């Protein structure tokens, strides 16, 4: 019984063959990058949703402190008339900022006062709670 034959590269050098191999390699790399980006975006979106769910979990607490929660794709905002705590998820990292709305005369967006980063939703929630404790005595 003979071994299966493998298709071997052409015995003569061919620009066409080399070009087609290179094009296929680049296409495979592009597809792998796009898939990795898509998976990362899905993970970031899921983390934003988890944080949002944690923040809206106690509507009585939110109402007692005049807080609202908003979720926009990769960012979650915890707001009061005086400040905004924003958490933005990108590339597996949560960036949490707090901005003061009391002295916003020029811009509709409060300037960030503090910023921290977190690697997980529980850590992001802890930082949000810390910023909130700084703003609400």
Predicted regions, residues:
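Amphipathic, interaction-prone secondary-structure segments
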Residues: 53, 57-100
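Intrinsically disordered, low-complexity regulatory segments enriched in Ser/Thr/Pro
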Residues: 82-124, 134-137
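C-terminal partner/receptor-binding element of secreted or periplasmic proteins
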Residues: 127-130
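Alpha-helix boundary/N-cap detector
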Residues: 10, 39, 43-46, 50, ...
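Charged, low-complexity eukaryotic segments
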Residues: 1-35
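Contiguous, amphipathic alpha-helical segments that mediate oligomerization or scaffolding
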Residues: 22-66
């Amino acid at each position: 019984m003979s071994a299966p034959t493998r298709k071997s590269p052409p015995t003569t050098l061919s620009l066409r063959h080399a070009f087609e191999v290179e094009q296929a390699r680049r296409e495979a790399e592009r597809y792998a990058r796009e898939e990795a980006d898509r998976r990362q975006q899905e993970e970031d979106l899921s983390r934003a949703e988890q944080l949002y769910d944690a923040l809206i979990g106690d509507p009585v607490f939110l109402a007692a402190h005049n807080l609202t929660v908003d979720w926009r794709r990769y960012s979650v905002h915890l707001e009061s008339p005086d400040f905004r705590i924003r958490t933005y998820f990108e590339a597996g990292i949560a960036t949490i900022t707090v901005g003061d709305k009391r002295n916003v005369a020029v811009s509709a967006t409060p300037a960030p006062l503090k910023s921290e980063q977190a690697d997980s939703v529980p850590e992001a929630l802890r930082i949000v709670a810390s910023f909130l404790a700084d703003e609400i005595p």
